[in-house]
Amino acid sequence: MDIRFQNLGPEHWKGEIMLAPVCQDEVLTEICPQMDKAAPWLAIAPALRDFKGKTGELALMHGHPELAVPRVLAVGLGPREKVDTAGIRKAVAAAVQLCRQKGFGSILLPEPALARLPGGRERLVEECVCASLLALYRFTALKKAEKDEPAEPQWLALGFDGQEVPDASHAAARKGENAAWAVMLARDLASTPPNLLYPEKLAERARELAREKGFACTVLDEHELEKESMGCLLAVGQGSGRPPRLVILEHAPEGHEQEKPLILVGKGITFDTGGISLKPAANMHQMKADMTGAATVLATLAALAQEDAPRRVIGLLACAENMPGGRAMRPGDVVRAANGDSVEIQNTDAEGRLALCDALAYAQKTWTPAALVDIATLTGACAVALGTQIAGLFSDDADLAERIRAAGGACGEEYWPLPLWKPYAEQLKSDVADICHMGPREGGAINAALFLQHFIQEGVRWAHLDIAGVDWVSKPTPLCPAGPSAFGARTLLELARGGVL
């Protein structure tokens, strides 16, 4: 769906349907005169009498089919004092989904109707554009087209009140468009079956995007990983016929080549059986999305390059397939990490932290980061603690943690700080190695974060995002169908856009 602008005034607005966001108990024809001018028949629409503007309420009203704006969809936002950006985002997405179901090819969204709502004019433009595009997302690459499927809306136009489109509004719309593109890219990657997307293929896709969008991409194969002493990442992939890869991405726009980079590290386990510590069969198919962390990092770098963001950002994708087999790592194995420490493996289904620790060590050995953030579907313990709507955030840098929470909160991705409880580090001690890669079941998310922190050098600003639990949507929502959510992609993009760390 294209995003357009109409700025000749409401009398000249066009669209098969106009969205009209309304707070509870407001009179639709009085709150925004521009909407009344665009659809002068609205005051006598019978459905208007019954519309209350409650949260989630939608009312479709019809005028004469030959009019420039023949339909209005009233979108209820609930009580004004409770309206927020998250509610507006969800309401607009639900409205756009209804437009698709009805087969409307063009949608008009009056910008003056957004300007009167809380949240900030430009921010709401960005969020509504992003929400409208995400509302239409479906992973259909492997399916035949359905004969009776209604056509997708061709465009959504933001209507302005007879003025030039402000530069800030234009930029906000493009930011929303780019953010939605990044989320959809990450969802596509995480939805792709593991027989079609494995470490080499993910690396190939990264190279393609780098050529297309104009950022750098380097891939370390298994032989180069051996030279870099990445024994942990190699161990994760050694049971698979698909060798591991470390994908290195860099967006360094002109004038920013020498600045300290924001480094993003994503877990890229393209399929996770659990290895020798085999997972239960139920829902194992969802483990194709165990590379969501890597998908969000790749999507972020591509989106930054696409909008030519003035910030140097490096992304590392630690990619492997965790399979059982005669060569697979075993519980009790000891391997050597990239920082030189020996690591005892106790459970092969705790493989994500092994892949990440080598990538984190490599990042600090190669660059001096302004900040280092890893993102991973790491622990079921985090999902048990926080559920399916909030991700875990670990950091001993209060400023970095707050920036991440603010970035996520601005775009509907929420994080809850969890402790790096130092006494628990004692539980990672090993009798046979420098460190054991996991502790007891209790406090599992904390133990995993403490293991990663072991590989963070003194003075490096670091945060760990555990997105287990929020990476997969079981029931469809207005903003996401059932399946991979790409949670974290918008947070990372917002964080990278946010200026000096």
Swiss-Prot record:
Subcellular location: Cytoplasm
Signal sequence segment: none
GO molecular function, one term: metalloaminopeptidase activity
Disulfide pairings: none
Cellular component annotations (GO), alphabetically ordered: cytoplasm
Binding site for Mn(2+) 1: 272, 349, 351
The protein, known as: Probable cytosol aminopeptidase
Cofactor: Mn(2+)
UniProt-listed Pfam families: Peptidase_M17, Peptidase_M17_N
Organism lineage: Bacteria, Pseudomonadati, Thermodesulfobacteriota, Desulfovibrionia, Desulfovibrionales
Enzyme Commission code: 3.4.11.1, 3.4.11.10
Gene3D superfamilies the record matches: Leucine Aminopeptidase, subunit E, domain 1 (3.40.220.10), Zn peptidases (3.40.630.10)
Major enzyme class: hydrolase
InterPro entries, per the entry: Leucine_aapep/pepB, Macro_dom-like, Peptidase_M17_C, Peptidase_M17_leu_NH2_pept, Peptidase_M17_N
Active-site residues, record numbering mapped to chain: 279, 353
Function: Presumably involved in the processing and regular turnover of intracellular proteins. Catalyzes the removal of unsubstituted N-terminal amino acids from various peptides.
GO BP, sorted A to Z: proteolysis
Stated family: Belongs to the peptidase M17 family.
Keywords: Aminopeptidase, Cytoplasm, Hydrolase, Manganese, Metal-binding, Protease
Reaction catalysis annotation: Release of an N-terminal amino acid, Xaa-|-Yaa-, in which Xaa is preferably Leu, but may be other amino acids including Pro although not Arg or Lys, and Yaa may be Pro. Amino acid amides and methyl esters are also readily hydrolyzed, but rates on arylamides are exceedingly low; Release of an N-terminal amino acid, preferentially leucine, but not glutamic or aspartic acids
Residues annotated to bind Mn(2+) 2: 267, 272, 290, 351
Cofactor detail note: Binds 2 manganese ions per subunit.
